[in-house]
């Protein structure tokens, strides 16, 4: 499974590297930015079953809750060095994958990713592999900053997770219980989603803070 993730991560890094990274324009943008919220928007293919359309908010909510619990903090140390931290919201056991990982996309953005207690590093590395290689638009107003994943990478990430029973189960486990939805209902919803997702938008909104 780890080798599979490494292959996918390599593809994601290549995809991410094609997109444009913009340097942070102002010194005042440096420092720690707390994770405020994760936004996920799923678009289905034209002609997708109505039942799936009704299930879109459910799946979007699951991913929002999960990644909001995973993402901890982002720190810009200079105009091209970003440090990010993630933690697994469900496992409390030590992992051999725990540590700090280094990435560089193109010539501009270097990333240090610190993983705490994470038995499925591939999933998080995939997320950040897509996130750090994408366009990020510094917004000085109200001290907000948004990291926007490229749609193609976001779609790949969501399909990879939903298409893997183990990972889909972990994401669902970390999310709040869904009233009235059985395991069979969830499995059917996920199966339909995998076949009918057209596009996915994913972003993390940050706010300056200690």
Which residue ranges define each predicted feature?
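Sec-dependent bacterial lipoprotein signal peptides
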Residues: 1-20
């Amino acid at each position: 499974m780890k080798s599979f993730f490494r292959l996918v991560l390599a593809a994601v890094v290549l995809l991410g590297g094609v997109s444009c990274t913009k340097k942070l324009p102002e010194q005042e943008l440096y420092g720690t930015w707390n994770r405020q919220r994760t936004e996920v928007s799923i678009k289905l293919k034209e002609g997708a079953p109505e039942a799936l359309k009704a299930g879109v908010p459910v799946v979007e909510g699951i991913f929002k809750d999960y990644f909001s619990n995973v993402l901890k903090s982002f720190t810009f140390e200079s105009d091209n060095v970003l440090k990010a931290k993630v933690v697994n919201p469900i496992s409390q056991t030590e992992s051999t994958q725990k540590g700090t990982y280094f990435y560089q996309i193109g010539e501009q953005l270097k990333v240090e990713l610190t993983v705490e207690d994470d038995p499925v590093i591939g999933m998080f590395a995939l997320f950040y592999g897509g996130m750090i290689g994408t366009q990020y638009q510094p917004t000085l107003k109200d001290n907000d900053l948004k990291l926007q994943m490229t749609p193609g990478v976001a779609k790949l990430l969501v399909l990879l997770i939903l298409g893997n029973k183990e990972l889909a189960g972990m994401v669902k486990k970390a999310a709040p219980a869904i009233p009235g939805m059985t395991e069979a209902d969830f499995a059917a919803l996920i199966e339909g989603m995998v076949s009918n997702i057209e596009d996915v938008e994913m972003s993390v909104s940050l706010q300056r803070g200690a």
